[in-house]
Amino acid sequence: MDLKSNIKLILATDLLAVLILSLFIKNFKMVLAFLLAVFVIWLFIDKNNINERLYENLLAMSVGFIEGILIFLGIIYNEVFLDITLGIFAILILIVMGILFPKYKLIFEVFDEFVEHLKQKSGFLTLISIFGMLLTIYVFLLILPSKEFCINAVDIIRTIMLVITANMFIIEFYTFKKFS
């Protein structure tokens, strides 16, 4: 299949996931919001020159979207799941900070290798996937009635999303500047 067909298959899979979730929690506003997002994406994929990068980014976002739906269902049916998820995020952040940046003065020396490693190991796509997952959880938590754990989770997820977005822009700007 060509790239356009692959992208349309990804969007169809995401739409199916949204329909199942909407039927499950009986909230059909999400389907309308997702159809609007699909319409905006469709404007990009109807062009003649679809590149591999757009396809990879959309695929990573789609994987994150489906992961977000699964985690959202876990949060609804088990509030302890949220605490476990936050604990895992905190441990991962500590591990990454401890391994990559053991001392603050080494950050600039490590940055070149860090960016190269991200590009080679599809780390950028991983960031996009995580961003899609967090965005999905964020939107679904806003739909829930205001509970204490939802408000705290929304604040934490918003912060993580801002950090990931800043990192993606830094990586893209850095590699664009380096190779241009």
Swiss-Prot record:
It is a multi-pass membrane protein. It comes from the Archaea. The chain crosses the membrane at residues 4-24, 25-45, 57-77, 81-101, 124-144, 156-176. Disulfide bonds: none annotated. It is found in: Cell membrane. Keywords: Cell membrane, Membrane, Transmembrane, Transmembrane helix. The keyword Membrane applies. The keyword Membrane applies. Signal peptide: none annotated. One of its GO terms (cellular component) is plasma membrane. This is Uncharacterized protein MJ0271. It comes from Methanocaldococcus jannaschii (strain ATCC 43067 / DSM 2661 / JAL-1 / JCM 10045 / NBRC 100440).
